[in-house]
Swiss-Prot record:
Belongs to the small GTPase superfamily. Ras family. Keywords: GTP-binding, Hydrolase, Nucleotide-binding, Nucleus, Transcription, Transcription regulation. This is Ras-like protein family member 11A. CDD domains: RERG_RasL11_like (cd04146). NCBIfam families: small_GTP. The keyword Hydrolase applies. It comes from the Eukaryota. GO terms for molecular function: G protein activity; GTP binding. It catalyses: GTP + H2O = GDP + phosphate + H(+).
């Protein structure tokens, strides 16, 4: 099931060897969070390379960087892959200690669970609540992703449960198969990038609106011209009196 579909061009561009060749765009910083073995690393690599790799060593928080084009705009995208040892029974303090740095750093979030692992689904709510605690203004976009949608025979989390949770939290929900559908994976990251860009633009508009324009100060040429005009007027007045 795909509750959301996106269209438009979204192309990967290699990172230049020398950053001096480019005027680097504003960074977009995303974090992918979730329990272990839900496919976070596979999602990121699938998006960046179009390749699906099923088995990964437990990660310790790898950071991926790419220049990408979103609807014709070049952006510097960074994606933080987070450690996956978080389960619903873990204490809040354990979760905060392991993820707070990434949550503070990122501007947009993917919360990933596996439809074959109900405990990974249960970890989504505390992750969401922690993000909102760190970003209390509620502006940071958060998407909930049910991964491994191709493993229907092993499903433990129904689609309506993902939708219900997303509705309760006020988040967007997608159910995808990283292994079978690259386009769905691309749509997830593409749409999240667009939401982060939207937040940036709204913030910029508010800052511009709050700035009071300074009165234009006369420059030296203006002052000289006015001085000459004053002298000329004074001379004409003197001649008329004589």
């Amino acid at each position: 099931m795909r509750p959301l579909t996106m269209s438009g061009h979204f192309l990967l561009a290699p990172i230049p060897e020398s950053s001096s060749d480019y005027l680097l765009p504003k960074d977009i910083k995303l974090a992918v969070l979730g329990a272990g073995c839900v496919g976070k690393s596979a999602m990121i690599v699938r998006f960046l390379t179009k390749r699906f790799i099923g088995d990964y060593e437990p990660n310790t928080g790898k950071l991926y960087s790419r220049l990408v084009y979103v609807e014709g705009d070049q952006l510097s995208l960074q994606i933080q892959d987070t450690p996956g040892g978080i389960q619903a029974q873990d204490s809040l303090s354990q979760m905060v200690d392991s993820l707070t740095k990434s949550v503070h750093w990122a501007e947009g979030f993917l919360l990933v669970y596996s439809i074959t692992d109900y405990e990974s689904y249960q970890s989504i709510r505390p992750l969401y609540q922690h993000i909102r605690k760190v970003h209390p203004d509620g502006k940071a976009p958060i998407f909930i992703v049910g991964n491994k949608g191709d493993l229907l025979h092993a499903r433990q989390v129904q689609t309506h449960e993902g939708l219900q949770l997303a509705n309760e939290l006020g988040s967007l929900f997608l159910e995808i198969s990283t292994s079978e559908n690259y386009e769905d994976v691309c749509d997830v990251f593409q749409h999240l990038c667009k939401e982060v860009i939207k937040v940036h633009r709204l913030g910029g508009e508010r800052r511009r609106a709050s700035v009071i324009p300074r009165p234009r100060s006369p420059n030296m040429q203006d002052l000289k011209r006015r001085f000459r005009q004053a002298l000329s007027s004074k001379a004409k007045a003197s001649s008329a009196l004589g």
